[in-house]
Amino acid sequence: MSDSPVTLPESIKLTEYSHGAGCGCKISPKVLSTILASQLPVFTDPNLLVGNQSRDDAAVYKLNDDIGIISTTDFFMPIVDDPFTFGRIAATNAISDIYAMGGTPIMAIAILGWPINKLPAEVAQQVVDGGRQACMEAGIMLAGGHSIDAPEPIFGLAVTGQIALTDLKQNDTAKAGDRLYLTKPIGIGILTTAQKQKKLQDEDSHIAVNAMCQLNTIGTTIAKISGVNALTDVTGFGLAGHLLEMCQGTKLTAKLKFDAVPLLPRALDYLALGCVPGGTHRNYDSYGEHLPELSEHQKAILCDPQTSGGLLVAVSAEAEAELIALLDAHHIAPICIGSLETPTTEANVVLY
């Protein structure tokens, strides 16, 4: 099957129809906190194992003593011009939340907003087909969905998954001494901004796309390692933002080896050209007070919003070799980017 079954007129470029792109469209963490601060009485359900208290990747509901159901949704505006590829990336990103909990996806439904007076329905059909392709790669059906007439194109999924409760991983359960590993390089926001600014060279157009279309299926297997204490995916809040969620949920400090953070090819070249997404600045404004003093270069990398980014893994020293062997077997460079320690400073993240 071709990744682009219908040829688009040269005049149609999806990124020109939206003010934001991918997970860079996310509302900043600080504003989101205001939105989620409900004034209603607290309602609890003992079977809801994971809700929004820890800003985890998905909700988990206990069906019985052995099995839980995972529920998540994610959608955004175009991050690439090709509609099929946009749909595939958006779906891959949404499904990732299931893997980030250690689960297995079982079905998805589509969420589509479309400016029907600006873009042909045939273009939307290609977007949905891209979503179907990602679902097929994940082994699930795109079982339905909902659409509205919207001023800008939006696409994503609501995904349902299941998990053996013994394998459930959360973002706030790390332990002091855990090593930190990242399964995909950073730099997607930089490269996609280069495209939006029309600075991206044709020979580099595949770099971010290939990374964003890579499913995080390895999360299901990582979760079976008993020494993996916490797991999350790195998306719109950037590496620093999602690492902070892990630290604040466990009251630990992350010692981050900045020079060890893996970067996508050419990311530094485009960063030098000023390709910094607006989401980077929003991220830093939201949580910069919890970080050490950073250079502009460090901010641009650590706060770079990722779309369909990799998994951030916190693993005990005793299980580190098992994780490394698994990453090697899946052709993922096993690079330790730091560790989690008992706090010795007010900052949640320190660099060395």
Curated annotation (Swiss-Prot):
Binding residues for Mg(2+), per the UniProt record?
57, 97, 233
- Its EC top class is transferase
Q: Which InterPro entries match?
A: PurM-like_C_dom, PurM-like_C_sf, PurM-like_N, PurM-like_N_sf, SelD_I, SPS/SelD
> Its Gene Ontology molecular function terms?
ATP binding; magnesium ion binding; selenide, water dikinase activity
**Site Important for catalytic activity: which residues?**
26
Which biological process annotations from GO are given for this protein?
Answer: selenocysteine biosynthetic process
- Annotated keywords: ATP-binding, Kinase, Magnesium, Metal-binding, Nucleotide-binding, Selenium, Transferase
For this chain, the annotated S-S bridges are none
User: Cofactor binding mode, per the note?
Assistant: Binds 1 Mg(2+) ion per monomer.
Q: In which domain of life is the source organism classified?
A: Bacteria
Necessary cofactors = Mg(2+)
Keyword check for Oxidoreductase: no
The catalytic activity of this protein is classed by the Enzyme Commission as 2.7.9.3
Active-site residues, Swiss-Prot/TrEMBL = 23
Question: Signal peptide position in this chain?
Answer: none
> Listed GO cellular component terms?
cytoplasm
Q: Where does ATP bind?
A: 26, 54-56, 74, 97, 145-147
Q: Which reaction does it catalyse?
A: hydrogenselenide + ATP + H2O = selenophosphate + AMP + phosphate + 2 H(+)
Q: State whether it acts alone or in a complex, and with which partners, per the record.
A: Homodimer.
- Known function: Synthesizes selenophosphate from selenide and ATP.
**Similarity comment: family membership:** Belongs to the selenophosphate synthase 1 family. Class I subfamily.
PANTHER family hit by this protein: INACTIVE SELENIDE, WATER DIKINASE-LIKE PROTEIN-RELATED, SELENIDE, WATER DIKINASE
The name of this protein is Selenide, water dikinase
